[in-house]
A protein has these predicted regions:
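Extracytoplasmic
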Residues: 7, 174-176, 235
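Secretory-pathway-linked proteins and extracytosolic
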Residues: 1-111, 242-245, 249-266
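Hydrophobic/aromatic-rich core segments of domains that either
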Residues: 136-225
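Flexible loop/turn segments at secondary-structure boundaries
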Residues: 20-21, 105-109, 119-120, 159-165, ...
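Short, conserved helix/loop micro-motifs enriched in His/Cys and acidic residues
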Residues: 74-79, 107-130, 160, 171
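Active-site-proximal cofactor/substrate-binding loop regions of enzyme domains
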Residues: 92-108, 121-132, 136-151
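Solvent-exposed beta-strand/loop surfaces of large extracellular or lumenal domains
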Residues: 1-6, 158-163, 224-226, 266-267
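Conserved catalytic alpha/beta cores of large enzymes that bind or transform nucleotide phosphates
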Residues: 12, 211-240
């Protein structure tokens, strides 16, 4: 620790440390390895103290400032929303048509350059380019649902790669954005980056994780539902016969949930 008239400098040194091994299906490094996490709560300019991230409210306030600076133009995709919902039998079908259209037609490409790593792209840009990152895809899903008359909101969430929750007010807490839909007293979470997740299904990487939901000047903290293991099963039904010393048979394999998504991504 070194000090001068204006600053205090903390220097951490680590030497002769082996590289961290990578193992399939292991938790993220923040679960496994000793590390330092710097939480910038405030700073002072002369006698004035300026807050940064001392609470989840501070974190949300900054995220909201980014969202408020966006210039969404729903007129660009209003006709597409009308087309997707015109022949729907009910509200659930309208929601599914919009959600699945985003999954099928918007290609996921990550953007992490400067403020673009935190600020969603305007929805009309994602719609016209037909690609975006999780933030842009979440925003397009939200705006298309709003155009259709639904209460849809942006969400910030950390995947199961990250050990922290929002009790730690830091930009290190989350690495993903999704969309929340409020309908008949229930919340549904829509992740356009999960190409093969059906409406009401949640990827294993976000199940049980704390989620920060926009709510005007306030925010809502909730958790993504954890689904029963049986929703992700792979079932095999195999019958064999021996016909003149030749083995013959029929195989039926049924994939559900995450196993279905993995199969579809592979083939």
């Amino acid at each position: 620790i070194t000090k001068n008239a204006e600053t205090t400098i903390y220097t951490y040194t680590i030497e002769n440390v082996s590289g961290n091994p990578k193992e399939s299906f292991s938790p993220g490094p923040s679960f496994l390895y000793p590390h330092l996490l710097f939480v910038a709560k405030s700073f002072s300019v002369k006698t004035e103290k300026k807050p940064l991230f001392s609470s989840p409210a501070d974190l949300y306030k900054w995220y909201k400032s980014l969202v408020d600076s966006m210039k969404d133009d729903k007129t660009v995709f209003a006709a597409k929303v009308k087309e997707l919902t015109a022949n729907a039998k009910n509200d659930e079908e309208k929601i599914k048509n919009i959600y699945y259209w985003v999954q099928d037609n918007i290609r996921y490409i990550a953007f992490e350059d400067g403020i673009a790593g935190f600020k969603p792209d305007d929805s009309q840009n994602v719609f016209q380019k037909k690609y975006g990152d999780c933030k842009g895809m979440a925003n397009l899903t939200k705006q298309m649902l709003k155009e259709a008359g639904f209460d849809a909101r942006l969400c910030w969430i950390g995947t199961n790669h990250i050990a922290y929750d929002y009790s730690t007010p830091s930009l290190s807490v989350d690495n993903h954005m999704i969309c929340a839909l409020f309908k008949n007293g229930k919340k549904y979470f829509l992740d356009g980056t999960e190409k093969y997740n059906s409406f009401g299904e949640y990827a294993q990487r976000i199940q049980g994780k704390e989620v920060l939901i926009e709510d005007g000047d306030k925010f809502i903290l909730d958790k993504i539902p954890v689904q029963n293991a049986t929703t992700n099963t792979e079932k095999s039904n195999i019958s064999y016969i021996i016909d003149n010393e030749t083995l013959k048979g029929k195989v039926k394999i049924e994939f559900l949930g995450e196993s279905r998504a993995s199969f579809l991504y592979s083939y």
